[in-house]
Amino acid sequence: MSKLGRAARGLRKPEVGGVIRAIVRAGLAMPGPPLGPVLGQRGVSINQFCKEFNERTKDIKEGIPLPTKILVKPDRTFEIKIGQPTVSYFLKAAAGIEKGARQTGKEVAGLVTLKHVYEIARIKAQDEAFALQDVPLSSVVRSIIGSARSLGIRVVKDLSSEELAAFQKERAIFLAAQKEADLAAQEEAAKK
């Protein structure tokens, strides 16, 4: 880049206005990346945003991922719209897992019942994205079943505690073997 181009880039004003969409963890908004630089480019006070967001989410369990819209106004003030937790958070919580499957379709990371899916759908149907489009509950349920499938979570009609315990034991053995294989692969790569 020429000296003139660099000088011109240095003189540009920061972007003002617009909407920033992000998933921010409840009570854990911090001025660092990835949110800090995006807000800084728009001229928004990062510390003020973090303070306001953390204050508004203090009643929610810390660490829950919340879809957030930040409406930046031309005078560099902002308005925060906080949505409900993500579908993947609800599904992973219902299945009792931390991560989805590595290879969806080939492995099952967890199990949820149709009752779980229905309860999640009732909560998410109130979400702005579904409510504005007047989406029927059956469509929300299908959407959540699709999300579960993409996470490697199997939706079953009924699930007894014995079946769940057997699945969790089997899954723990599978994850331990997977971790062992990963460590062996890392050691092999380090030797090369």
From Swiss-Prot:
Oligomer status and interactors: Component of the mitochondrial large ribosomal subunit (mt-LSU). Mature mammalian 55S mitochondrial ribosomes consist of a small (28S) and a large (39S) subunit. The 28S small subunit contains a 12S ribosomal RNA (12S mt-rRNA) and 30 different proteins. The 39S large subunit contains a 16S rRNA (16S mt-rRNA), a copy of mitochondrial valine transfer RNA (mt-tRNA(Val)), which plays an integral structural role, and 52 different proteins.
Any one GO molecular-function label of the UniProt entry: large ribosomal subunit rRNA binding
UniProt keyword terms in alphabetical order: Mitochondrion, Ribonucleoprotein, Ribosomal protein, Transit peptide
GO biological process: mitochondrial translation; translation
One Pfam family matching this protein: Ribosomal_L11_N
SUPFAM superfamilies documented for this protein: Ribosomal L11/L12e N-terminal domain, Ribosomal protein L11, C-terminal domain
Cellular component terms per the entry's GO annotation: mitochondrial inner membrane; mitochondrial large ribosomal subunit; mitochondrial ribosome; mitochondrion
Main location: mitochondrion
PANTHER family with a match to the protein in the record: 60S RIBOSOMAL PROTEIN L12 (PTHR11661), LARGE RIBOSOMAL SUBUNIT PROTEIN UL11M (PTHR11661:SF19)
Designated name of the protein: Large ribosomal subunit protein uL11m
Taxonomic classification: Eukaryota, Metazoa, Chordata, Craniata, Vertebrata
Gene3D superfamilies: Ribosomal protein L11, C-terminal domain (1.10.10.250), Ribosomal protein L11/L12, N-terminal domain (3.30.1550.10)
Compartments in which it is found: Mitochondrion
Family: Belongs to the universal ribosomal protein uL11 family.
Alphabetical list of NCBIfam families matching this protein: L11_bact
